[in-house]
Structures are given as structure tokens and as C-alpha cells.
Amino acid sequence: MVQRWLYSTNAKDIAVLYFMLAIFSGMAGTAMSLIIRLELAAPGSQYLHGNSQLFNVLVVGHAVLMIFFLVMPALIGGFGNYLLPLMIGATDTAFPRINNIAFWVLPMGLVCLVTSTLVESGAGTGWTVYPPLSSIQAHSGPSVDLAIFALHLTSISSLLGAINFIVTTLNMRTNGMTMHKLPLFVWSIFITAFLLLLSLPVLSAGITMLLLDRNFNTSFFEVSGGGDPILYEHLFWFFGHPEVYILIIPGFGIISHVVSTYSKKPVFGEISMVYAMASIGLLGFLVWSHHMYIVGLDADTRAYFTSATMIIAIPTGIKIFSWLMNPFSKDKNKNKNKKLIRNYQKMNNNNMMKTYLNNNNMIMMNMYKGNLYDIYPRSNRNYIQPNNINKELVVYGYNLESCVGMPTYTNIVKHMVGIPNNILYIMTGILLTDGWIDYTSKKDLDKKTIMEINCRFRLKQSMIHSEYLMYVFMLLSHYCMSYPKMKIAKVKGKSYNQLEFYTRSLPCFTILRYMFYNGRVKIVPNNLYDLLNYESLAHMIMCDGSFVKGGGLYLNLQSFTTKELIFIMNILKIKFNLNCTLHKSRNKYTIYMRVESVKRLFPMIYKYILPSMRYKFDIMLWQKKYNMIN
């Protein structure tokens, strides 16, 4: 048994080994990703106690594990070894022993990578290993050297596998199978093998030069010795961008076969799909510097790489629309698989649009001189100061670590688990009045389905209060996916216009729903004392408060029992020293705040009240009579 798995030259056995390694690496990489996400879930240090080096080491480990030890071994080594010989009618690959060596080099690389994280403080260089952060001055120990050796070993493994797949495809096809008759998955592995063969030597050269700089006193990337660290970036991204297609083209091949299976017909335009994959692979070598816009490329260089990148959308579009041309059968048992394919196609369409917008950045940087809010109108002013920011950095932030420059998305990631306190106070005031949290717009979901989905926050206001609704929307814009919409509501037979917005369905709102709801009934949370402040009271008044003649205030809180209203009233008395009583109006109880309490409350909440909502106060009367506004 041991001999079979250690010395096997059978392509299927080796494919199983690739899958096992990929699963192990995927679990380790996912664990690192969870630690990273938990650390970023809220501002400040959460679990790593401010150890930024450890955070960087986790980023390096996660990236290298996922790219070189999960996706590439699974898609190329696993599916390629298992399916390619079967699809071309070969008994095995052309070089079975090289195939075995190609796999067993990978675990050695994994050992080097794990060792690099344990030596001294680890390799905290970021997954791109840019100098001078990866130079001997920043990382004097052997951790970066071990990480470079790990990359070398994965490169050797991929090169051996690529040579094996190319020779197998060219020389071991069954009789009568010409190149034009090859299945699309075989073509995808064949094209990917050429990409590996052409790009990996460049990466190996770059990291070897870095290794020499670190250990043999050369100056390839050392500025003080006449070197240029930008050279490393060019070498890395000449490999890095084809690597994107190395990862996705085998997926293209798999999706093509799945689409063909469920449509029960060949993929539309099979030959054009092959040429599209080849074009994507070729153009992938001509666009690497779109990852480097921020390093100071001249205008002509940026214009070339922008144009070349946009051209890649043409062969990608051919593939997308060829998949869309295949209608699916009416087999009801395959709905989940159809949804999977449709979602994959939607994802590709979104990526195409993102690529198009991303590559207009050069035009925006050269021609646009306006405010940042006009570029990102939904960016939160609490996170970005428009007059003190480098617009080029924000626009080209897509190309750094896919996090800078996307304020909407990064804010969602930050607050998926917990809502920041300043927003939580506001939402508490709104949820006690007109706001509510629901599961979905569909009413036919069973209980099991409801438990598996996240919740969203909703708010409706009449057109009179549209400015207030837009103000709340701007505060929560990084949770939202669309702008507020106008709807026609009917109350007691009368129609009137109102505005409504709702957020994305996120875990943070699910947690809020568990606090404020019991089933479908809104309740008062037990920890309401900690969730209220003066800003919460201001939003309670703006949402559903009304002043009466004489200076008193009614809080028309929604859907609460008498006991819950008494509980809220006691909190207002204890925490804010407000004298409140219960009044019954139209068979409903409301909280009435006496005029003396309103006098004390008004200066505290005045700064939170919007100008359009001050009609609820007689401002001139309060200024003149009580002299409470500075």
C-alpha cells in the first residue's frame, strides 16, 4: 500500500495525491484567512495584540498556500492527471516517472513554506515579496530565503507537469483524434501548460536575483548599489498576470463540459472557444504593468497597458456568450447545478465590467480634477477625508492588494460581524421607531430556509422626511447595494408617496434581529440601557416623535407592549434623568416626556437634529424663551 502511493506512476493515483495535498493546503489556508478576517472585523487590534509582522506572515502563508498548493495542484495536477489521459484515449501520461517527481517536489516546498513561518519572526513580505521589504535589511533571518526556496520547488513541480502535459497531448492521442477534435478541457490544460512554461522561468529568475541580493552582496534590486526594485516588480508581474489565467483557464474548460452536459448538446462555437482561450493566454503576457500603475509609469506606457487590458475583454466575452447560447434542458433534478453555472456566468460578467472600469483609471487620473465624492459618491465621509487624499492612490488601489480604493466593499468586510458603536446607537433609535429588520422580500420561505439566510435593515419615510431618510442612507451606504426607491403606500384608502431603502443581507443584521425580535414580533432588547445615547434619542424623535403645544414630547414607539414601554421609560429616567409618563391615545400607549425634561434634553440633541426636521421644534420659541442655543 505504501509503495503504491509513494512510487506510483499511475496518473490517477497521482491525481488523487494532488487532491489530498490540495485539500490539506486549502484547510490550512482557510484557517489563516479566518484569522485575517477576524483581525479585520473591527478597528484596532483584535486577536494578534498589535503584532503586524505576524499578520503579514499570515497573509504570505494564506496567499502562497491558496495559489501554489490548492488551486494549481487541484485544477492542473488533480483534474489534469485524472481526465486528460482519459479524454485523449491514452493509457497514461508521456513521462510517468516525471509525473511522480512533479508531485513529490510539492510537499518539500510545503515544508519549506511552513518552516519559513516558524524561523525567527517569519516572512512578512506580503505575497508579492517586493524588495526592499524582502531585502536583507528588513528580513535578516533565513525566513525569506526558505519562502523563496518554496517558490522554487513549486515552480519546478509546475514546469515538470507542464512538459508532461504538452508531450502527452501532442504525442499520445488516440487514432483519428486531431487537435481540432480535442475536448475543451484538454485544450485548457494544454494552453495552461504553455503559460506555465513561459511565465515560471521569469518568476524563478526574479526570486533568484533577490536571493543573490540577500546572500551574495549583488545589487540587482538594491538602490544603493545601482539596482532598481521596480525591475523586480516587472519580473514578478510578468509571471503574476499569466498566473491569473493559469488558475482560471482550467476552470473555463471544466465549466464548458458542465454546460455541455446540462444542455445536452456541444458547446456553442467550440473552435472559437479554443481560439478565445489561446488569445486570453497570449494577451495575458502583454498586460502585466496594469498591476503597476502607481509606481510612476509614464503616460504612454499607461495608455498602452490600459488599451491592451481592455482588449482581453473580447475573447473573454466570446466565451461568456458562447456559454449563454446553450439553453438548458427541463430536467427538474438539476436545478442546483444550473444555478451554479448561472452564478459562474454572472461572476464572469461582473469581472469583465470591473476590468473595463478599472482600466479607465488612467483616463480618470489624467483628466479628472474634481472631488473624490464625485468618483466614489457613496464613500463614507467618516473614513475618507476628500481634501486630504491622493486620488490616484484610491483609483489605482485595485492593483495593490485588492482592498485600498474600494471603500464600499472594504467597509462591508469590516462590519460584516459587528456594527461600530456610532452606527449601532443610531440604528437602535431607528429600530425603536420606524425601522425594521426582515429576512427577505419573499413570503414563501419555510423555517429551515429562513434560519440559513442573513437579514437586512429597512426604513421607510414619507416624502416630507426624505432628507432624513437620505441622511440615514448615507450613514449606512457601505451596507447598501442600491439607492432609495420611491413607492406608493396606501393608508386608510388614501395613497401617498414614500421613500424606502434596504441594506444588503449581512450577518451583523442577523445578530441585530435576534436582539430586537422574537420570531416576527419586535421586542425591546434586554441590554437597551447600553444601546441608547443622545444620538439615539435624536433619531427616535426624528423618526416618530412629535411635540405638542406647551413643549411636551410624544415618543410614538412602534409595536411594543405596555410592559416594554414602561421598561423604556424607566431607562430614560435612570440614564438621561428624563421625567416620562405613559399617555393613552387612540387605544395605544405612548411615552410622554414632560416639558422640563425636554428643556434639559434639547441642548444635548440639537446638534444631531437635521435642519429639515427642526419643524418639530419651535426653534425661535425655544431660543427666545429658554435661551438654550449658543
UniProtKB/Swiss-Prot annotation:
The mature protein may arise from proteolytic cleavage of an in-frame translation of some COX1 exons plus the intron containing the aI5_alpha open reading frame. Its main location: mitochondrion. InterPro entries: Cyt_c_oxase-like_su1_dom, Cyt_c_oxase-like_su1_sf, Cyt_C_Oxase_1, Cyt_c_Oxase_su1_BS, Homing_endonucl, LAGLIDADG_dom. Keywords: Endonuclease, Hydrolase, Intron homing, Membrane, Mitochondrion, mRNA processing, mRNA splicing, Nuclease, Transmembrane, Transmembrane helix. It is a multi-pass membrane protein. The chain crosses the membrane at residues 16-36, 57-77, 101-121, 147-167, 182-202, 235-255, 267-287, 305-325, 417-437, 464-483. Residues 325-630 are annotated as: COX1 intron aI5_alpha encoded. It is found in: Mitochondrion; Membrane. It holds the Pfam family LAGLIDADG_2. Optimum pH is 9.5. It comes from the Eukaryota. GO terms for molecular function: cytochrome-c oxidase activity; endonuclease activity; heme binding. GO terms for biological process: aerobic respiration; movement of group I intron; mRNA processing; respiratory electron transport chain; RNA splicing. Its EC number is 3.1.-.-. It is an enzyme of class 3 (hydrolase). Residues 1-324 are annotated as: COX1 exons encoded. Its cofactor is Mg(2+). GO terms for cellular component: mitochondrion; respiratory chain complex IV. In the N-terminal section; belongs to the heme-copper respiratory oxidase family. In the C-terminal section; belongs to the LAGLIDADG endonuclease family. Heterodimer of a 32 kDa catalytic subunit and a larger 60 kDa polypeptide subunit. Mitochondrial DNA endonuclease involved in intron homing. It introduces a specific double-strand break in the DNA of the COX1 gene and thus mediates the insertion of an intron, containing its own coding sequence (group I intron), into an intronless gene. Recognizes with limited specificity and cleaves the sequence 5'-ATCTTCTCTTGATTAGCCCTGATCTACGG-3' after the nucleotide sequence ATTA leaving a four-base overhang and a 3'-OH. This is Intron-encoded DNA endonuclease aI5 alpha.
